Amino acid sequence: MNIMVCGLPGKMAQIVAAACAKRNFKVIPFSLTGEDMAEFNGFKLLNISNRDEKIKDILTKYPNLIAVDYTHPSAVNGNAEFYVKNKIPFVMGTTGGDRESLMALVKNANHPCVIAPNMAKQIVALQAMLEWTAKNFPGAFNGYKLQVIESHQKNKADTSGTAKALVKSFQDMGATGDVIEMVRDEDSQVKKMAVPRKHLDGHAFHTYSLDSIDKSVHFEFRHNVCGREIYGEGTADAVAFLAKKIKAGQAGVFDMIAVLKG
């Protein structure tokens, strides 16, 4: 299969390209980007000004193409429109953007894609467990106050999509509170969140705290990730899953829970 990893020279895009190459997927030498660059490590970088004129030749040379998007929140919707317009199946690893418009676009087009706020399979499994708990025990945390703090590398522009998803599950269990504190200052990340200095440029530390009204009971859920490799491997799994669905003639929108189920 041919894979176009979009978002180079970004670090996440580089890790995904390496993860896909490791599985012997054909990573083509082109990438959509917002950077004002023409080339990076042998990859030709396409931006809004030239991608429309280049894509036909790319699709002719590299048929059965799947795009993997790790660009920027501001590019999510425009890139998705580009993929749908050119009938390019895609895995959307970029968070942010207008998610309602994104989902409406791909559902109306019945476009084959995987869209998820988190590509780490283990964290997705945790998310699924909390969604199940919320559905089956909707009053489990009635009266509890929820506080959330998340730390990511300083260049992550948006609030964590995973944090938003878990907040919804806790709210569905009766907890109150929807403020997510973003920590992007490196001194605070080290002192407040205990992020190792060597992982300041790539980490995801989340803490969800629930307290009873009289503060006599405290629950805390935490997941800390150092580095980006876990997301690269999960993304490669999503690519393989999507390719399998396409080969079977199945279109539509999938998430990482579907990937986990196979």
How should these model regions be labeled?
Residues 2-58, 142-262:
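C-terminal substrate-binding/catalytic lobe of Rossmann-fold NAD(P)-dependent oxidoreductases
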Residues 21, 84, 107:
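Anion (oxyanion) recognition and catalysis
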Residues 32-33, 95-97, 118-120, 151-153:
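Short, ordered loop/turn segments at secondary-structure junctions
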Residues 56, 60, 77, 81-85, ...:
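Amphipathic, non-transmembrane alpha-helical secondary structure
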Residues 58-78, 88-89:
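Rossmann-like NAD(P)-binding element
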Residues 74-81, 93-115, 121-132:
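Rossmann-fold NAD(P)-binding glycine/threonine-rich loop
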Residues 125-140, 158-159:
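Rossmann-like NAD(P)H-binding beta-loop-alpha module
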